[in-house]
């Protein structure tokens, strides 16, 4: 028989200091630029190594405050599919977090099966870290070869 327990609410991290922040990214290098993610983490001041996880576990990690930031920057030509992100975005937002593209715009689900209007990548974090994360993305982008 199933064990009944009271549900526990989840909440994104309250971490405000990027040096103490933890970040996660996709395991798969085939469709994601881990080097660019490392550059963003460095520009943000994150000192920890990335937590590399599969699927929507990344969103769950941010929603539970196991990670403070999730970043994914797809390689040129790769199209993000909505089913890889939709449920995770809802979970992070319900936990008090923010999910946007790398330009700071909320994800647009109206383009069919792909996130056609995606600006460079996807980030998920707390409201406390989002603006600084956007600054780090911009700084990394201006010095990258992507």
Which residues make up each language-model segment?
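DPxDG-like acidic metal-binding loop motif
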Residues: 1-5
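An extended, acidic
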Residues: 9-146
């Amino acid at each position: 028989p199933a064990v009944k327990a009271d549900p526990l609410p989840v909440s994104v991290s309250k971490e405000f200091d990027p040096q103490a922040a933890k970040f996660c990214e996709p395991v798969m290098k085939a469709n994601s630029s881990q080097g660019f993610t490392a550059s963003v983490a460095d520009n943000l001041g994150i000192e920890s190594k990335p937590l590399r996880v599969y699927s929507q576990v990344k969103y769950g990690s941010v929603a539970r405050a196991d990670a403070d930031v999730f970043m994914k920057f797809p390689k040129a030509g790769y199209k993000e599919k909505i089913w890889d992100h939709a449920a995770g975005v809802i979970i992070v937002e319900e936990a008090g977090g923010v999910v946007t593209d790398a330009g700071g715009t909320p994800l647009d689900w109206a383009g069919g099966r792909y996130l056609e209007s995606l600006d460079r990548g996807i980030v998920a974090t707390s409201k406390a870290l989002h603006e600084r994360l956007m600054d780090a993305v911009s700084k990394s982008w201006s010095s990258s070869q992507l």
